């Protein structure tokens, strides 16, 4: 009985008949099968543990067309859960071919939405037979395959007869026309290649160390340049020099030596400093005004009966706050009841007709 796993995306709840339709298709195509279903988020977080090499087929159901990407960690988990030659199909992404191949899957030739876990290739062992037990002809005849060549060591007599100063080599007993010089040349070539590889790898490492020693941090150069005074680094041309050897304090009208830019920079720094000081002073004044206002609110002004008593300005010896009501409008306050009346003498009876109308 086949084991089938359904991985459901959380958006499956938008279509209540989608999962049932998939299960019906599985019953029609496979028949009797053991079907399990899990939410893919729970599998990714590790809340649901899946057994390795268990499922013959895993189907991913995702109705969200705009987001079908699968993390590489989930691909690896699905790969480990499938059996050999198992299939992972369904609503799979089509833009993650590299991740699919890196995980170990093979994309089906007939369907891009089907990934197959390949069966591992078994290694074939080739037995090596000892010298002297069987001849090459007997080995090839008995096994029906091409026999491996057998080698034997050259004797000292043959070396003396050949008067060769080369080291003792190996000869192939299965090949009659073996060229010993070719074998020695191949050995020397391999040794030479290995020596070249070692030399160049050592030289590359030394070059890397030298490059690291010669690297200068650019930030250090910037710090050093900032520590110097701008005026000390200024080069004044001959045309701007004063005859007595002194330097100009201000830049010329058409300055080209950089003194004008330095002055503008210093002026900008001074202006920013003044703005910051004025801003702090304004802020402190605002805070002080707020404190005074709060203090006045906590201590309201109260008038006594003496302050609220009415004063008769017609009686001699009694005056108002200004004491000039009898002199005329030019000497009267804004709220004086005698505004608009001619001047009068202290003690003179004054009638105010406008008050009667108001009453």
UniProtKB/Swiss-Prot annotation:
Localization, UniProt: Cytoplasm; Mitochondrion intermembrane space
Pfam families according to UniProt: CIAPIN1 (PF05093), DRE2_N (PF16803)
Span list, region Fe-S binding site A: 240-257
Composition skew (Low complexity), residue ranges: 155-166
Binding, [2Fe-2S] cluster: 240, 252, 255, 257
Family note: Belongs to the anamorsin family.
Domain comment quoted from the record: The C-terminal domain binds 2 Fe-S clusters but is otherwise mostly in an intrinsically disordered conformation.
The protein's name in its UniProt record: Fe-S cluster assembly protein DRE2
């Amino acid at each position: 009985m086949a084991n089938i796993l359904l991985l459901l995306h959380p958006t499956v709840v938008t279509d209540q008949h989608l999962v049932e339709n998939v299960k019906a298709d599985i019953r029609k195509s496979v028949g009797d099968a053991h079907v399990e279903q899990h939410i893919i988020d729970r599998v990714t977080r590790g809340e649901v543990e899946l057994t390795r090499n268990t499922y013959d087929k895993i189907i991913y159901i995702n109705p969200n067309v705009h987001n079908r990407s699968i993390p590489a960690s989930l691909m690896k988990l699905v790969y480990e859960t499938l059996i050999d030659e198992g299939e992972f199909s369904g609503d799979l992404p089509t833009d993650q071919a590299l991740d699919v191949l890196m995980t170990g899957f093979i994309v089906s030739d007939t369907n891009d939405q089907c990934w197959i876990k390949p069966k591992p290739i078994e290694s074939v062992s080739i037995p090596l037979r000892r010298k002297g037990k069987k001849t090459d002809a007997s080995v090839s005849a008995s096994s029906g395959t091409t026999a491996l060549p057998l080698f034997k060591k050259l004797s000292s007599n043959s070396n003396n007869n050949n008067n060769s100063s080369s080291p003792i080599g190996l000869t192939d007993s299965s090949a009659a026309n073996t060229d010993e010089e070719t074998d020695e040349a191949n050995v020397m070539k391999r040794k030479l290649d290995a020596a070249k590889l070692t030399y160049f790898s050592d030289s590359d490492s030394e070059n890397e160390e030298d490059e690291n020693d010669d690297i200068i941090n650019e930030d250090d150069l910037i710090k050093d340049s900032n520590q110097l005074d701008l005026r000390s680094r200024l080069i004044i041309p001959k045309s701007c020099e004063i005859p007595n050897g002194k330097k100009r304090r201000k830049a010329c009208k058409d300055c080209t030596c950089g003194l004008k830019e330095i002055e503008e920079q210093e002026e900008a720094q001074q202006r920013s400093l003044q703005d910051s000081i004025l801003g702090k002073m304004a802020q402190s004044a605002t805070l002080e005004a707020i404190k005074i206002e709060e203090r006045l609110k906590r201590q309201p002004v109260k008038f006594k009966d003496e302050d609220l008593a009415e004063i008769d300005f017609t009686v001699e010896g009694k005056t108002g706050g200004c004491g000039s009501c009898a002199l005329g409008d030019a000497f009267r306050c804004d709220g004086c009841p005698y505004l608009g009346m001619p001047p009068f003498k202290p003690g003179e009876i004054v009638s105010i007709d406008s008050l009667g109308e108001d009453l």
